[in-house]
Each structure stands twice: as C-alpha cells, then as structure tokens.
C-alpha cells in the first residue's frame, strides 16, 4: 500500500525515510495511535511527516510548531509532496485559515482557539520539535484533540529538566536516526569540529555571574581572539557565511558591534519578525551581499534550514 501511495507524489522518500515509513505503518497496523520519530537535524523530518501523511491520507491534518518561519517552510514541503490534492492554510497571529484541508499552526495560536474546533476535527496531527511538547500550550492541544494518529518529530528527546517527552507519545519510537548515521548515509553534511581553548574568559562563573561572563566574552581582546580563529579555520577563497549563537540580546549586540570591526555583522532575536529573519538568512547566503556573520538569540536553535552556511 505504501509503495502505491508514494507513486502519487513526484517527490520520493529516501532510503532512510522509507525505513521510517514502514515502521510507522507497522505500528499503526498493531493498533498504536501515537508515535515519536527521532531524527537528526537536517535529515528530512518534515518530508518524512509529509510522506507518512500522504500514505495515511487524512481528510484533515493539523501541523503544530512553535516558530513562524518553520511553519511556512513546513507548509511548502507538504504542498510539494501533495501537489494540488489538498489545500493548505496557516493558522497563526497573521492568518486564520480554518477551511483548508491541512492547517499549519503555531502552538500559541491553536492553544488559544481550541474551542473553535471539534475534538475529532483532525484525523492526523503532527507535533514538530516535540521536545517542547511538555509545555502547557502543547499539552492542552494534545489533550484536547482526538486524532486517529498523533506523530511527534524531534532531533532529541532529551530535555535539561528531565521531563519525559517519549511518554506523551505512548513510549512508541518506531524509528531513530542519530547524527552519526545521518552523516554516514549522506543525509546531512559532514563537518570539521574544532575545540579551541579560550583563556580570556572565566567559564567557571555561576549563573549569577552571567552579565560578567558576557562582558568578558564580548571584550575587544576576546573578539580579536575570535577573529584570529575565524581566519585560521574559515574556507579559503570563499565568502564567510557564519552563524553565531548568543546567550541573550545584550550578548548578541555586543558581539555584533565588536566583531563588526572585522566583518559585516547583524543580530537577530525573537523580537524580529519572520520576514526580517528570512531576509537576513538570504543575505548571509548571497554571494553578492555583504553580511558575513549573523548573531542569533534563541531563534536558530532548531528547525531552520540555511544550507549556505560554512561556519558556526
């Protein structure tokens, strides 16, 4: 049945996705109504979900994720897989498209609107980046709806607070694809990892010393050291396209300012609208644009695909 249904799509699942699809089919065949797929970042989780939905063939589908740019890219992925056979709509702060076959919603928007939907409104529900599923907004959505099948997607089921994500999905993990296996199977790009000793910063500071730690990291002396390391390890003859992860907005602003002495920099946070973020991602990857280092706070930790990046 799966092979027959897949023939209806111009885009085909890769080898690893086909293994996951077979296992999801098997779990449903034995009566399981929930499952969690663990798959390395960038290995094709969204396409996997779209292929499984194509095989399941729901009348109505709900896709939940926490971030707007991920939401729109997920919608586009489903449109590519389904073609014109299903209508797709957004349900977030900017749009409330409720009549479409498939709805793509942020957790916050859907949590605030549950009373507008019947409990059995959706046959198939997908929770993307589902390590967030222990949060109240997600739990309200999961506890409210009664789909025929609930699928969770994540790159890691482990949380710093040790709350159990797997239990939410009935302790069912039909498929796992860890980082090493994804690289071996050419699903994600291999990378060179450099551990660099930094003697200018006291990393032994406790949480209460966070401001002091950020000040040390952002000093001109330390930024000069970072500049030296970037130049030592960057891709020779190529435009630098680097992402830098920061603790908070103050940290990002200070790093962008100080490394701005050497590179064209910018910083983004949750305060930037989706359109602003996408423009920055495009500028970073564009050979004809000046942007070389993009500093980010919280928004690039998961679910964003920026294939042109050559340094983190």
Regions found by a protein language model. Name each.
Residues 72, 87-98, 243, 253-254, ...:
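Conserved helicase ATPase core of P-loop NTP-dependent helicases/translocases
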Residues 30-53, 245, 295:
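Walker A/P-loop
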Residues 122-123, 292-296, 300-312:
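A short beta-strand element within the Helicase C-terminal
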Residues 2-36:
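Conserved pre-motif I regulatory segment
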Residues 48, 55-80, 247-250:
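Conserved Walker A/P-loop ATP-binding site and its immediately adjacent core
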Residues 93-124, 135-140:
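Conserved helix/coil segment N-terminal to the catalytic DExD/H
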Residues 131-193:
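Post-DEXD/H (motif II) to motif III coupling segment of the RecA-like Helicase ATP-binding lobe
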Residues 173-243:
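Conserved interdomain linker/interface between the two RecA-like ATPase lobes of SF2 helicase motors
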């Amino acid at each position: 049945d799966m092979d027959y249904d897949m023939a209806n799509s111009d885009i085909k699942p890769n080898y690893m996705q086909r293994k996951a699809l077979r296992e999801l089919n098997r779990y449903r065949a034995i009566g399981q109504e929930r499952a969690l797929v663990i798959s390395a970042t960038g290995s094709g989780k969204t396409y996997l979900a779209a292929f499984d939905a194509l095989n399941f063939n729901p009348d109505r589908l709900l896709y939940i994720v926490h971030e707007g740019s991920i939401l729109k890219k997920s919608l586009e992925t489903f449109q590519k897989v389904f073609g014109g056979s299903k209508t797709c709509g957004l349900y977030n702060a900017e749009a409330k498209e409720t009549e479409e076959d498939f709805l793509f919603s942020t957790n916050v928007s859907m949590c605030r609107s549950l009373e507008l939907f019947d409990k059995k409104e959706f046959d198939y529900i997908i929770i993307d980046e589902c390590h967030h599923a222990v949060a109240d907004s997600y739990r309200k959505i999961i506890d409210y709806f009664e789909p025929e099948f609930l699928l969770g997607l994540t790159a890691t089921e482990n949380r710093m607070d040790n709350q159990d994500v797997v239990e939410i999905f009935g302790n069912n993990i039909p498929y796992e694809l860890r980082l090493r296996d994804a690289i071996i199977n050419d699903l994600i790009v291999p990378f060179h990892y450099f551990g660099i000793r930094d003697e200018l910063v006291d990393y032994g500071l406790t949480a209460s010393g966070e401001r002091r730690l950020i000040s040390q990291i952002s000093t001109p002396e330390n930024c000069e050291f970072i500049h030296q390391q970037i130049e030592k390890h960057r891709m020779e003859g190529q435009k630098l396209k680097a992402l830098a992860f920061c603790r908070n907005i103050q940290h990002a602003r200070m790093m962008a300012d100080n490394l701005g002495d050497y590179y064209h920099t910018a910083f983004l946070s949750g305060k930037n609208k989706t359109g602003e973020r996408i423009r920055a991602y495009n500028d970073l990857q564009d050979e004809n644009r000046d942007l070389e280092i993009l500093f980010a706070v919280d928004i690039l930790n998961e679910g964003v695909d920026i294939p042109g990046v050559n340094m983190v």
